[in-house]
């Protein structure tokens, strides 16, 4: 059986947690930041977690994580 390929785009975006979940970065924090409130930008800094329904898809893209 051949080795499975890791999806490199997913590898750069998702990190596996110790409990088996995946974390990623929030979106909407790259540009057009002047109209966004400080509290909104601060909350976007914290890591986001992947929804439970999306975990099988992420696992398929990251077979060795």
From Swiss-Prot:
**Which branch of life, at top level?**
Bacteria
SUPFAM superfamilies xrefs? L35p-like
Q: From the Swiss-Prot or TrEMBL record, give the protein name.
A: Large ribosomal subunit protein bL35
GO MF annotation, one: structural constituent of ribosome
Q: Which family does it belong to?
A: Belongs to the bacterial ribosomal protein bL35 family.
A GO CC annotation recorded here is: cytosolic large ribosomal subunit
* Record flagged with keyword Protein transport: no
Check the record and name the InterPro entries matching this protein: Ribosomal_bL35 (IPR001706), Ribosomal_bL35-like (IPR021137), Ribosomal_bL35_CS (IPR018265), Ribosomal_bL35_sf (IPR037229)
Q: Which gene encodes it?
A: rpmI
Chain residue ranges for the region called Disordered: 1-21
Q: Which Gene3D superfamilies match?
A: 4.10.410.60
Presence of the UniProt keyword Ribonucleoprotein in the record:
yes
Annotated keywords? Ribonucleoprotein, Ribosomal protein
Q: One Pfam family of this protein, by short name?
A: Ribosomal_L35p
Q: Please cite one Gene Ontology biological process associated with this protein.
A: translation
């Amino acid at each position: 059986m051949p080795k499975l390929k890791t999806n490199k785009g997913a590898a750069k975006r998702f990190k596996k947690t110790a409990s088996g979940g995946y974390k990623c970065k929030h979106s909407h924090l790259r540009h057009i930041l002047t109209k966004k409130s400080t509290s909104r930008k601060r909350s976007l800094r914290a890591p986001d977690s992947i929804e439970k329904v999306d975990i099988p898809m992420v696992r398929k893209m990251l077979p060795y994580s």
